[in-house]
């Protein structure tokens, strides 16, 4: 299963801050590689800077049964705790 998180930053987040956040978020999500059932993680920035676009895609390749383990993981808790303040909105989408 692919677990996708589309991220839209708050309007006051400039390009320099987006670059800093990208580096930090990649580091946070790199910790998922230690979890059995997670096969890969990609943190992909959008290449078109328009107000009607999302800024970031986080795509996690995992076994469907691993989703509760991911939800309880330290990287997921760090993501929700430390980065929610930068987000205008996010969308979650899962597919096989």
Spans of features found by a protein language model:
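An amphipathic, aromatic/His-enriched active-site/gating alpha helix that lines ligand/cofactor pockets
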Residues: 27, 31-36, 61-93
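Short S/T/G/P-rich N-terminal loop/turn motif that feeds into the first structured element of a domain
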Residues: 1-54, 65-69, 96
């Amino acid at each position: 299963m692919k677990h996708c998180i589309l991220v839209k930053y708050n309007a006051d987040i400039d390009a320099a801050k987006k670059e800093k956040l990208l580096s930090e978020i990649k580091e946070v999500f790199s910790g998922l590689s230690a979890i059995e059932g997670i096969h890969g993680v990609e943190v992909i920035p959008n290449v078109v800077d328009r107000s009607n676009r999302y800024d970031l895609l986080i795509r996690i390749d995992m076994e469907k049964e691993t989703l509760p383990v991911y939800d309880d993981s330290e990287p997921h808790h760090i993501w929700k705790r430390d980065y929610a303040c930068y987000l205008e909105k996010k969308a979650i989408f899962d597919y096989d």
